[in-house]
């Protein structure tokens, strides 16, 4: 069930929004109007499909090693391009003061736009401050990405040793969450200052590329976007095909076949996921809708992923019940939002609906866990001997396995988690505060 859910449904949704984003960029860059076609196909979609086929080809041929190697090169190219555009935007508009000077003519509050943290307002009411609190206190860890996700696990397992994997993940958190977004944000602010509310805000970035960059540099930055696009696509396809083949076909449908057969199945699954993602991209007009949907349909699953390290009773039904319940809640909120009575209610809007879903999902999966059969003691004991999870929740299994308790394991793990959260949030907010003219908070 998990393989089908994440490997196919969710994976296809992510691929679709990446394709749609790239299509929007290409349409702006090429100056195409809506309706422009190439060999009878929408011009933006046609170009993305060509790039997509290239990414699919080397993903299918190279496997995880090829994906990781190309990701390193593509990440460097993508970051270099985004940093250059951010610096050029900052210089062209005269820094923060220049951006502020251009805001008064627009229909939004420049102070609120440039505020690193929203101004405190009344709690338990629909406002930006409440939404901010919900995002940082609940949404980010309650969803499926709390453990990093499958493609992060792939890379951690492929590391030389545990020490390498720990430092790799720390670097990923800092680079991916704290540093990578800020060049994009600077360019986005520049786009808001220059273009205001003209056109689709999701196209401001390529509009800034055309406005700011000279021809040669423009080509390099555009190439960096292609690199980021293909890096994301090959990562998603490699992870998705590994779930489909190893967790679905090999275990339940196509058992006992040769390695060669499974390699062929992996390549075919890459092609299948690519086709599904391309088809799904045609249905997307708003990119943010896709990631909000994913956070909503996985709300509460993060609590299962955390609990399984501290409570031996968590089983497969815990995760399945959380997924099903979150999906049902998301569907119910979507139906409510489409009716006149609830159309304007914040209850049906992200992130309020996501948090409500989480509050429903948690008691459901705990109840299902207690009502279903636990994992066999032999498997739990084997897991405990290998991993040595801490806390009182594993005490029964520890005694059954005849293993000495590691003193302070749970406390040490909790302190490391807390330190990691503080590091990431402090670096993220501190960097932004320095950029946005709040040095006191930044330092």
Description of each model-found segment:
Residues 1-443:
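Membrane-embedded helix-loop-helix hairpins and adjacent transmembrane boundary segments
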């Amino acid at each position: 069930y998990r393989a089908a859910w994440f490997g196919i449904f969710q994976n296809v949704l992510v691929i679709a929004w990446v394709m749609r984003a790239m299509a929007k960029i290409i349409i702006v860059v090429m100056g195409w109007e809506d309706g422009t076609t190439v060999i009878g196909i929408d011009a933006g979609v046609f170009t993305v499909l060509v790039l997509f086929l290239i990414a699919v080809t080397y993903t299918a041929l190279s496997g995880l090693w090829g994906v990781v190697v190309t990701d390193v090169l593509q990440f460097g190219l993508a970051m270099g391009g985004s940093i250059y555009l951010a610096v050029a935007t900052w210089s062209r508009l005269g820094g923060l003061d220049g951006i502020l000077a251009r805001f008064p003519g627009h229909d939004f509050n420049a102070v609120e736009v440039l505020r690193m943290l929203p101004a405190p307002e009344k709690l338990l009411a629909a406002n930006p401050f409440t939404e901010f609190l919900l995002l940082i206190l609940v949404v980010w860890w309650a969803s499926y990405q709390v453990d990093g996700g499958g493609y992060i696990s792939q890379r951690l397992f492929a590391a030389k040793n545990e020490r390498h994997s720990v430092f790799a993940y720390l670097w990923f958190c800092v680079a991916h969450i704290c540093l990578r977004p800020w060049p994009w944000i600077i360019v986005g602010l520049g786009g808001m200052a220059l273009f205001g509310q003209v056109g689709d805000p999701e196209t401001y970035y390529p509009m800034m590329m055309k406005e700011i960059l000279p021809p040669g540099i423009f080509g390099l930055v555009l190439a960096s976007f292609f690199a980021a696009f293909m890096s994301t696509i090959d990562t998603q396809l490699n992870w998705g095909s590994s779930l489909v083949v190893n967790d679905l076909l090999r275990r339940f449908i196509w058992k006992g076949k040769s390695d060669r057969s499974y390699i062929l199945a992996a390549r075919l699954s890459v092609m299948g996921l690519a086709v599904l993602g391309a088809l799904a991209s045609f249905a997307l007009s708003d990119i943010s809708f896709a990631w909000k949907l994913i956070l909503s349909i996985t709300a509460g699953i993060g609590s299962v992923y955390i609990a399984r390290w501290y409570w031996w009773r968590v089983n497969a039904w815990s995760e399945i019940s959380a997924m099903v319940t979150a999906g049902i809640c998301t569907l119910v909120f979507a139906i409510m939002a489409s009716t006149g009575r609830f159309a304007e209610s914040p209850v049906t809007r992200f992130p309020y609906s996501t948090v409500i879903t989480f509050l429903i999902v948690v008691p459901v999966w705990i109840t299902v866990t207690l009502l279903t059969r636990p994992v066999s003691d032999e498997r739990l004991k084997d897991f405990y001997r290998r991993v040595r999870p801490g806390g009182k929740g594993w005490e029964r299994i520890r005694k059954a396995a005849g293993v000495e308790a590691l003193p302070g394991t749970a406390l040490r793990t909790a302190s490391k988690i807390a330190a990691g959260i503080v590091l990431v949030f402090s670096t993220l907010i501190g960097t932004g505060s320095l950029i946005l003219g709040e040095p006191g908070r930044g330092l």
